[in-house]
Amino acid sequence: MRLLSVLVFLISVISIAKADYQYAFCKFNELSIGGVEGIAHLLSTDGTTLNITFDFTTSYAQNTQFAAQILTYGYNPSSMTNLGSVFDPTNVKTAGCPSGTPRAGDIGNIQANGGNVEAQTISLNIPNIKDDANSIIGRSIAIYGGSYDCSDPSKSVIGDMISFCTIGVGNIDYSSFDKSKLTGVNTASSYSNLENAIGLAVVYNTTITKGDYIEGRVLFKALNSSFIQVSAKVSGLSYQAHGFHVHQFGDVSSDNGTSIGGHFLKTGQEHSLPPSGTRHYGDFGNFCAFSQDMMDTGYYYYETDHVTAALVIGRGMAVHNFTDKGNSDVGGSRCGQGVIALIQDADYSLNLPMDWKWDVICANGSYYGDMSTSMNSESYNDNEPGSSSTVIPFFALIIFSIIFALL
């Protein structure tokens, strides 16, 4: 009996010592009003309670509190402040403060001192940052100039949105949390079964970039239950092939691109180029198509069933200085980075020139897409056999050799 008790105790200790956790990161965007600059950390150590810690400064020095909400979408390419309704997966519909029975996205009021907020934590029980229908990874947190009336939420005047941030999977190594208490692994994730997911990353330059200012967008859109379409347009790039990857973390706390971590992958996958079926989830090859009219703008187009759009929501993405050759040479430093946000508009498109011949391997380096008919590049797609471009010429060579021998 004593032995059984000891075993139960040891199992309990081991499970506690190796308990997984979820951590996410959110960096506030500056809007035309508010002058907000700062971040939010999201941490759950029990899978039930989500603790959101705010650290930001604003130009609203007169404010003693700010209303905060979790909104349905992480970004809107047409309107920065239209991010959908308050996140409400349980269909409560009525606004409220955490002390009552609010919608999942009603964070409540953030207390401020001279308009600034320092290390203030609010705990919520419905939203989470793990792989289920209540996950807010890829969605947004919005800050408003007004506040909730918690005694009568119907009278709340939260005012205009003064800032928002896209919630990405966080890199705990770049946080100020006591990591000695977090001995498991970070299992933060978007909801992997989210149907018809559309992800959009706004790309901006890292401090690695010298000279040109990099900016652009990368779009991940589900085509059907299996395939997604990945398209991108990024300006400020040098005329050469640039490695392109989805990374483990949607954490842009580091300006040099290191906090987004390594490539997004699952156990057993190895770094490679498309269309390898064993490559990392995040291995998308290279940008190498350029326009003669816009020589500093790189374009990308690819269709794949190797990963879903829902899985990459809330992850980071990077454009590298050089070519990813599919080996240990993955493209050098990260010159551009972004967080993949969940967006609403199913019709949104980057309007790429679809008559180009697309190449994501880029073995021949960069090329002008509008002159692709004269290029000797192959167009790669996961729904095409990767060897088809060499099999037919090989048999043609054999037949020609036989005919020549008979002459």
Curated annotation (Swiss-Prot):
It comes from the Eukaryota. It is found in: Cell membrane. One of its GO terms (cellular component) is plasma membrane. GO terms for molecular function: copper ion binding; superoxide dismutase activity. It comes from Dictyostelium discoideum. Cu cation binds at residues 245, 247, 263, 320. Keywords: Antioxidant, Cell membrane, Copper, Glutathionylation, Glycoprotein, Membrane, Metal-binding, Oxidoreductase, Signal, Transmembrane, Transmembrane helix, Zinc. Residues 407 are cytoplasmic. The chain crosses the membrane at residues 387-406. Glycans are attached at residues 51, 205, 224, 256, 321, 364. It holds the Pfam family Sod_Cu. Its cofactor is Cu cation; Zn(2+). Protect the extracellular space from toxic effect of reactive oxygen intermediates by converting superoxyde radicals into hydrogen peroxyde and oxygen. This is Extracellular superoxide dismutase [Cu-Zn] 3. It catalyses: 2 superoxide + 2 H(+) = H2O2 + O2. It is a single-pass type I membrane protein. Its main location: membrane.
